[in-house]
Design a protein with these regions (language model features):
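Active-site-adjacent structural segments surrounding the nucleophilic cysteine of cysteine proteases
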Residues: 5, 9-85
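Noncatalytic regulatory segments and standalone regulatory/sensor domains
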Residues: 10-27, 32, 149-188
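Extracytoplasmic/periplasmic, Sec-exported soluble proteins
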Residues: 46-55, 69, 89-93, 110, ...
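Extracytoplasmic/secreted envelope proteins and their assembly/folding machinery
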Residues: 55-63, 74, 78, 94, ...
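Mid-length scaffold segments of soluble, non-membrane domains
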Residues: 72-73, 79-113
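Alpha-helix boundary recognition
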Residues: 82, 102, 122-123, 174
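Active-site-adjacent substructure of cysteine-protease-like catalytic cores
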Residues: 107-155, 165, 187-188
Length: 188
């Protein structure tokens, strides 16, 4: 039984470590990665978070940043998604991007694909999540976060890649965007 209690202890310690409060130290949105060892090996549906956890990880970045609450880590969001029917074999459903945020007290709405609108929202401190298709960030489908607009460029946080998380011009990836959602601490 000592092996079982070791597993329990390790699991329990891991749960304690999953809180991302320390990632929220500065005034900038944290880049959280779906394959982070704190949650990457946990299951989301029939795959590990490292493989298919981009949706919950993006929403975690947005919600934890806007609330400054570290309990909304990627695995928390993944569990919420799965338990409430937002996960299917195709991945995370688009409705989760609004309902999941609302469940954490954050207002969310769909946004049109328009550079000026995107710039306006980001300048007001409203982060954006995009569903993207094949292109810079993915071979299939993926979610990314737009967190800032600076010097004519948009800061992208890619939950699957530190290397691809930097500033882009709108034209570099706008043709890959399938849908957008924008988030605010207060109601729109």
């Amino acid at each position: 039984s000592s092996a079982a209690s070791d597993v329990y202890k390790r699991q329990h310690t891991q749960d304690m470590v999953m809180n991302i409060q320390n990632d929220l130290k500065d005034n900038q949105m944290p880049l959280l990665l779906q394959w982070d060892e704190r949650w990457g090996y946990r299951y989301y549906g029939d795959q590990m978070m490292a493989i298919n956890g981009c949706g919950p990880t993006c929403l975690s970045m947005v919600v934890s940043y806007l609330t400054q609450n570290g309990r909304y880590h990627p695995y928390y969001m993944a569990q919420y998604s799965e338990q409430n029917g937002y996960y299917s074999q195709d991945g995370t459903s688009w409705s989760f991007m609004i309902r999941g945020a609302q469940a954490c007290g954050i207002d969310a709405k769909q946004l049109s694909l328009d550079e000026n609108l995107i710039k306006e929202e980001l300048m007001q401190g409203h982060p954006i999540i995009c569903s993207v298709s094949k292109g810079i960030f993915t071979m299939t489908g993926h979610f990314i976060v737009l967190s800032e607009y600076k010097n004519g460029k948009i800061r992208v946080l890619d939950p699957n890649s530190q290397k691809k998380s930097h500033y882009y011009s709108f034209d570099e990836f706008s043709n890959q965007i399938r849908n957008l959602w924008v988030y605010s601490r207060n109601s729109f």
